[in-house]
Structure formats: C-alpha cells, structure tokens
Amino acid sequence: MTIGKGTDVALCLHGFGRSAEDFTLFETILEPNQSIIAINLLAHGNSTFPSSRISRNPLSKEEWFYLIEAFVNFLGIEQFHLVGYSMGGRMAMVLAELMPERLKSLILIAPDGLKVNWVYRFVSETKLGRILYRSIIDSPNWILRMVDMLRFLRVLHPKIQRFVHVQLETKSKRQLVYDAWLIHRQLFPRLALLARKIEEHHIPFELIFGTYDRVIPARDGKRLLKHFKQEHRPTLLNLGHRLLHPTTVEHLSETGMWMPSAKP
C-alpha cells in the first residue's frame, strides 16, 4: 500500500501476523514531498509463496534482494528510507546488508533476528521439529498447557505466556507461524557485516526497543551494536512489543530520524 504522493520514499516492513496497514500510523508526520510504501511480507495479507517450496526450498537472501530491487526499480525509486518492525526488522537488516548503497536511512523497531531462538531453529530446521509443530496446528492444547505450567512455576514471564496464547489461538494463526517461519528461515542478517555496511555508507541509523518488551528485549540490541566502531545507543520507549504506536511516531518526528533529508 502507498501513503502520500512524494518522491522521498520510506519502504516499511511490518511484523509477524500484522499487515502493511500498520504503517498508516505514520501518515500524520508525512511531509508533502514524502510517501510511504508498505508491503505485506510473504504469507501475510495478499502476499503468497508456493506451498511446494515451504518445507524444501525457502526464500533465499538472493531472492529477497532481487524481489525488492525489481520492485523499487519498477517504481523508479533510486534510493529509499527503510523501516522494519519485529519480523520486518529482520527482513530490513538483510536488505541493508545486501543493498546499503540504496538506503537513505535505516530504522529498526524491536527487530527480530538479533539472535536465533532455539524453538525457531528446532521447528524450522529439523524434520522432527516440523512434524511436532504440524501436530500442534490441529491439536494445540498440550503445548498451551505446558506454557501455562511454566508460567505457574515462574519459569516464563506472563507477557510471554500471553504472546504464545495469542499466536496459537486459532488454526489459521498456527498455520501462519509454521508457514512464515519456514519460508523465511534463511533470512538472518550477519550482524558484523551489517554494522560495517551501515558505517561505510554513512547510513543514518536508529535502533528502537520497548522498555517493557519481553518478546524482543532491549538487551538483544547489544548483539548488533557491539560491532560498530562508533558508539550507538538504542532508544528505549515506555512501551512493550507493540511499538507501532503514536509514541514511536512522535519520537521519530521530534528527533528528526523519520526520513532524514541527507546523510551526515
């Protein structure tokens, strides 16, 4: 979807289980010369991926690069700002690694991909994990009871408990977890290379987390920031994981990090 009519473009990538429409929130701070192009990630909205490839031949980094390159070339966009939230943050980091020369700025909002969760690795990369998860698609009660027991034993934070219940509450959501995890399982950034590309190309960069986010906590940001030669500090907002929020919009507007006009 496109918001605005300006030639200065922000390409925006949403989070897991969400949609491109989430970025309508930023319409309030668009200047006349600016526009937002928000796309639905694969398996989300009206974006599809061949079902025959999900288990055996997932999306590769090269395919992701060529898809976006062809897309922006078709639209006649030479350079663009890149904004990624949660899962979209992981996809944005891969793009920044592969095509830094085309970025005007990079904003990562609670990005996935700073570390690989062992559950994700087990389900997406092992045959046993896939078989086990496919059984959960039809019969999720046992895994939900296990999550509740871990919460009762205080092993699991209540926000993580709620997050799991929300993600697995319907069969369509459980299928989306399986499809999205497997389709994108090869798309993880190389953090040291990403930091070097950002610095070499002088890309204005901001990393934003929610103070109360238990899904992707701010401490994960150290895994990326330690690779920069110059010191970078993450921005902490008084929010949880739902960071596509008016507070974030206000912060980016006030600090000038929303679609900055030029690289320093």
Question: Model segments located where?
Answer:
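Flexible "cap/lid" loop of the alpha/beta hydrolase fold
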Residues: E97, L106-I137
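Short beta-strand/loop motif that positions the catalytic acidic residue
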Residues: H201, L207-F209, D213
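Catalytic histidine-centered segment of alpha/beta-hydrolase-like enzymes
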Residues: V215, L236-E250
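Post-His helix in hydrolase/transferase enzymes
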Residues: D220, L244-W258
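Short alpha-helix in the alpha/beta-hydrolase fold that links the catalytic acid
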Residues: L193-A195, I203, P217-K226
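Active-site loop/oxyanion-hole signature of alpha/beta-hydrolase fold enzymes
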Residues: A38-V83
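Conserved alpha/beta-hydrolase catalytic His-Asp/Glu region
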Residues: S139-E199
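Conserved HGGG/HGGXW glycine-rich cap/lid loop of the alpha/beta-hydrolase fold
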Residues: T2-P50
